[in-house]
Amino acid sequence: MRGAVTPILRSLTPISAVLITLNEERRLAAALESVRFCDEILVLDGGSTDRTREIAEAAGARVEFRAWEGFTAQRNHAVAAARHDWILAVDADERITPALRAEIEALRAAGFAHAGYRIPRVAFYLGRWIRGTDWYPDPQLRLFDRRRGRWTGGLVHESVSVNGPVGRLRNDFEHHTYDDISDHLGTIDRYTTLWAQQARAEGKRAGPLDGCVASTWAFIRNYVIRRGFLLGEAGLTVSMFNAYYTYAKMAKLRELERTGMTGAAPE
């Protein structure tokens, strides 16, 4: 029986699951388990000092090392190092669900018809799935042909750009976001600083009231228009913090303008 199915399996387009890591020992194993259906699992580690590399190797992943150069550069190095042209990009805090796996398997059995595919992402936060606010459906282009696509971006919010048509998948992949509110606030602080530095380097400016107006609209959009109010305390918290993120990044840009700082160039 095994010999009978082997030719069929070999005719499928191979997929490389690609992850970048830096001290991800707590979350990595589950992410790796979720992509075991792929033909290769490649982990590009940026210099972890915990058990990340050991966990990846134990899971059967091919582990490569490259000193951390920032998210965009690291992701592109990982894509280039993969053995196969079709890439499934996953982070250590993300999981491919069984339903999404089945959809991807059916897609490649039929033959990939697009240069890449956007996949909806659902976050788990404060004890529940967040299907609302700006966090959902949060489509991410994570399945793509590297011959026609690459990661682009600056200090924050990198994404895949492809040359060709983009399809959409129906099933979500999971994002296990922050450990707690303190972790969330710490991430907001880091990312708003990076955003302000990048905006300053690009010559962007913010008026005195821009942060107030933009953050007010962010809360209305998240809590009312995108139905955060249906998600209880978690929906309110996400909406408030998304508004705070918007205000903080504008305030930090204003601060750079006042001090005359140019912003940081490298990631």
Q: Predicted regions span which residues?
A:
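Short, structured coil segments at secondary-structure junctions
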Residues: 37, 58-60, 139, 162
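Acidic helix N-cap motif at the loop->helix transition within catalytic regions
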Residues: 29, 50-59, 99-100
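A conserved acidic beta->alpha catalytic loop
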Residues: 34, 45-54, 91
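Short, well-formed alpha-helical segments that are part of the catalytic scaffolds
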Residues: 19-37
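Conserved donor nucleotide-binding strand/loop of the catalytic core
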Residues: 53-81
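Catalytic-site signature of metal-activated, phosphate-bearing donor transferases
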Residues: 72-79, 85-86, 90, 97-260, ...
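Cell-envelope/extracellular polymer assembly enzymes that use nucleotide-activated donors
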Residues: 14-16
